């Protein structure tokens, strides 16, 4: 077994999106080849309703999938196909935009005003850019949880772990999306398919991701760490990008550790991207925005 070396640390950056939603962006809208097939990861964690209630009013998507995973609060959504619904704590929405959809996402806090969730964008291969749009909505009760003997709990959003499979299926890039909670002081090795690109996103607790070249390690500390911490320390909004290998090794600190572990097969295709639309060529991108201007974006016979 080959432990994946830590390639890079990325601290999620404050970003303003939608109609004025304050969030943290771990990666996206830049060079994303190291994350292929993934394009963007946003952490929308906030306790101030004025920073998120304006939401994400009606906007288009084409050529991608958006994966919304809510931990606290709710997200009300509607779309151009007539779908309406609400994603609550622990729920998942996997939207395949395909040839085109226009939708809105409006967050609401819980009883204490807290809102927390993630949105991940996954690219679609050229052969599926113009597929029929669809949703896979999953309630929290339908997300399997694998409980290991050491107390580790893994919520399986997509892919498999410990002989159990997540509820989201039929996704081109064969992604694995896990929400991992490791008890204090425990050391854990998690399998990752060798040919996949993989990253972890820490959002709770503290710990170390162990490098292939021990004793090098990456520490993650709780939010609010002071300048006295060593340069290798990062708060719990840190993304850890891994090199190749077939496992990830992690050591939880005194408070335990919680993180997303996400991997997928790289598409290795050209990316032409502007805003909410991702195609393979600039001509396809221009054509998509032309269709938006002309009111033909949602037609079933719309061409690339």
Put a short name on every predicted segment.
Residues 1-304:
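Jelly-roll (double-stranded beta-helix
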């Amino acid at each position: 077994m080959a432990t994946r070396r830590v390639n890079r640390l990325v601290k999620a950056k404050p970003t303003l999106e939608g109609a004025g939603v304050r969030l943290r962006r771990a990666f996206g809208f830049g060079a994303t080849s190291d994350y292929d097939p993934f394009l963007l990861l946003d952490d929308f964690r906030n306790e101030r309703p004025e920073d998120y209630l304006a939401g994400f009013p009606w906007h288009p998507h084409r050529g991608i999938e958006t994966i919304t995973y809510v931990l606290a609060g709710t997200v009300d959504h509607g779309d151009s196909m007539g779908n309406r619904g609400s994603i609550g704590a622990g729920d998942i929405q996997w939207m395949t935009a395909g040839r085109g959809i226009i939708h809105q996402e409006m967050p609401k806090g819980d009883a204490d005003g807290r809102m927390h969730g993630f949105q991940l964008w996954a690219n679609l291969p050229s052969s599926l850019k113009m597929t029929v749009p669809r949703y896979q909505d999953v309630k929290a009760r339908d997300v399997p949880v694998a409980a290991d003997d050491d107390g580790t709990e893994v919520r399986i959003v997509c892919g498999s772990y410990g002989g159990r499979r997540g509820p989201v299926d039929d996704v081109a890039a064969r992604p694995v999306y896990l929400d991992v909670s490791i008890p204090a002081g425990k050391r854990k090795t998690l399998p990752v398919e060798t040919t996949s690109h993989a990253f972890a996103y820490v959002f709770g607790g503290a710990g170390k991701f162990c490098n292939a070249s021990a004793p090098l390690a990456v520490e993650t500390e709780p939010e609010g760490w002071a300048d006295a911490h060593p340069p290798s320390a990062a708060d719990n909004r840190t993304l850890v990008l891994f090199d190749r290998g077939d496992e990830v090794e992690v050591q939880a600190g005194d408070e335990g550790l919680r993180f997303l572990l996400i991997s997928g097969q790289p598409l290795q295709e050209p990316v032409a991207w502007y805003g909410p639309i991702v195609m393979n060529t600039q001509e396809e991108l221009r054509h998509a925005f032309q269709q938006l201007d002309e009111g033909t974006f949602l037609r079933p016979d719309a061409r690339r």
